[in-house]
Curated annotation (Swiss-Prot):
One of its GO terms (biological process) is translation. It comes from Mycoplasma pneumoniae (strain ATCC 29342 / M129 / Subtype 1) (Mycoplasmoides pneumoniae). It comes from the Bacteria. It is an enzyme of class 3 (hydrolase). Belongs to the polypeptide deformylase family. Keywords: Hydrolase, Iron, Metal-binding, Protein biosynthesis. This is Peptide deformylase. Signal peptide: none annotated. Binds 1 Fe(2+) ion. GO terms for molecular function: metal ion binding; peptide deformylase activity. It catalyses: N-terminal N-formyl-L-methionyl-[peptide] + H2O = N-terminal L-methionyl-[peptide] + formate. InterPro entries: Peptide_deformylase (IPR023635), Peptide_deformylase_sf (IPR036821). Its cofactor is Fe(2+). Coiled coil: none annotated.
């Protein structure tokens, strides 16, 4: 006996079959990472087109799998370097997306920004006392990475499925700037004073979070 489905049910099935699907069961691996000696990662990325295609969804799945594993304390389990954020071009997708998941001052911050734009930056500067690291930079570069004390950034947040605006300071603010730099083809060591890597100004805000030394 043939069962006739309602038109609404058939339409739902068609949508499921047609729309690209995101795989949220990926296991992170360091083989995903693109290092800083690759030409493309040193170049500006391109805007993401909507609706997202399968390549964009695959990138989102990888970014979330990698950083969430780090956040959950499973980096050693998967043999990866822990990170609090990752940009799309760090896993070989040359588009404007990044994902952050971290704790800062006892508050959990989590966002996956697509086509982010900086709309304001503080005049005063800031830096992490521990310095910065990067998943795509195997060689450590000693020195203070000078950034802005606060940042206001806007973009489409995939997690909330809407345009959002974030104003952030502290570790979260530093991480937003770090990941945005990646989308411009820049690395943290480009912001270290080449003549005096440990140079500081007494007016600059010092951030001293509890972070693994190799975390991005």
């Amino acid at each position: 006996m043939t069962k006739i489905l309602p038109v609404s049910t058939i339409s739902i099935f068609r949508i499921i079959l047609i729309l690209p699907q995101i795989n949220m069961e990926l296991l992170p691996t360091k083989a995903w990472l693109v290092l800083d000696d690759v030409k493309e990662i040193n170049e500006p990325t391109k805007p993401v087109q909507f609706p997202l295609d399968q390549a964009s969804l695959d990138c989102i799945a990888k970014m979330m799998a990698y950083v969430d594993a780090s956040y959950n304390g499973d980096a050693e389990k998967y043999g990866i370097i822990p990170g609090i954020g990752i940009a799309a071009n760090q896993i070989g997708y040359w588009k404007q997306m990044f994902y952050i998941h971290l704790m800062d001052g006892g508050v959990e911050h989590k966002c996956l920004l697509i086509n982010p734009k900086i709309i304001n930056l503080s005049a005063n500067k800031s830096f992490l006392k521990s310095g910065e690291g990067c998943l795509s930079v195997p060689k450590m570069h000693q020195g203070y990475v000078i950034r802005h004390e606060w940042i206001t950034i806007t973009g489409f947040d995939w997690l909330q499925q809407k345009e959002i605006t974030i104003t952030a300071t502290g570790l979260f603010g530093m991480c937003l700037q770090h990941e945005f730099d990646h989308l411009q083809g820049r690395f943290y060591y480009h912001r270290i004073n080449p003549l005096n890597p440990l140079f500081t100004n007494k007016e600059w805000k010092v951030i001293n979070p509890a972070l693994p030394s190799d975390s991005e």
